[in-house]
A protein has these predicted regions:
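Bacterial Sec-dependent N-terminal signal peptides
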Residues: 1-22
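Short S/T/G/P-rich N-terminal loop/turn motif that feeds into the first structured element of a domain
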Residues: 19-108, 115-254
Length: 254
């Protein structure tokens, strides 16, 4: 038991050190019901100002507000329909009070703006939420696009999955992403929560337009020489458990 405990501590320490080196990010998924247009107004017109000031002060590197793209017009699946994605330079920064930038709204927004936020917020309800923390294992950031695909998986070999993405696919996308409209790519390792129902890793592919993203999904063929080198069928035999598309609504860089 003592050896097992020591092994667990060493493994957690390795993850924490890696997160300190490469940064971490959180994905806060929401289920919002009611007048979602008003919810989007609150986030894009008012809370974006608060997030932007936090980024300019150096409290956070970046925060984005995104909307799920369901591909139909009837919201009957009761799934999460929004997500906040926020990056931090370290675990310490993630746990800092400065990371809760929304608490500064009263210092940033005028009295009139705060009153409008209160009125708009009365028209919708947060019905459910779930926050997930990842370490950024490696990414390519050439810009911010309008649409992003998040890919979640539970690979049998997490280290193998991540290393193949870094050594095989990252160099490939660095050379080819411009031609397909991809502006951002990366792979993350799940830090929390960890259980049998959650993904262990996440990758992302961001594009300028939804059309470019969909063309990537259905019409892009990976080169045969790289596929021969790939061991992803061994690392992740079940493939991705979910591939969700989100639209950028607002971010702290605007």
């Amino acid at each position: 038991m003592r050896k097992l405990f020591i092994s667990m501590v060493l493994a957690l320490s390795t993850y924490m050190i890696q997160a300190q080196e490469d940064g971490v990010y959180s994905m806060h998924f929401l289920r919002v019901e009611g007048n979602t247009d008003d919810f989007e107004k609150v986030q894009s017109m008012y809370m974006q100002k608060v997030a932007k000031q936090a980024a300019e002060k150096g409290d956070i590197p970046f925060c984005a507000f995104l909307k799920h793209v369901p591909m139909d017009n009837i919201d009957d699946e009761e799934r999460y329909n929004y997500v906040f994605v926020q990056s931090n330079t370290s675990i310490e920064a993630l746990l800092s009070e400065k990371n809760s930038w929304w608490n500064n709204a009263a210092d940033v927004l005028s009295s009139e703006e705060q009153a409008l936020v209160s009125a708009l917020s009365a028209t919708h309800t947060w019905k459910a939420d779930s926050r997930h923390i990842y370490s950024d294992e490696g990414s390519i950031a050439k810009g911010l696009g309008g649409f992003i695909q998040f890919n979640f998986a539970r690979p049998e070999n997490v280290d193998g999955f991540i290393q193949e993405n870094l050594t095989l696919w990252k160099p490939y996308f660095e050379k080819t992403m411009d031609s397909m409209g991809m502006v951002n790519w990366g792979v993350g390792r799940k830090l929390a929560p960890l259980d049998a129902n959650w993904a262990k890793v996440s990758t992302w592919d961001m594009f300028n337009t939804l059309e470019e993203l969909m063309n990537y999904r259905i019409g892009y063929k990976l080169p045969a020489n790289l596929l021969k080198k790939s061991k992803m069928k061994d690392h992740n035999p079940d493939g991705f458990m979910m591939m969700s598309i989100f639209q950028m609504i607002a971010n702290s860089a605007q």
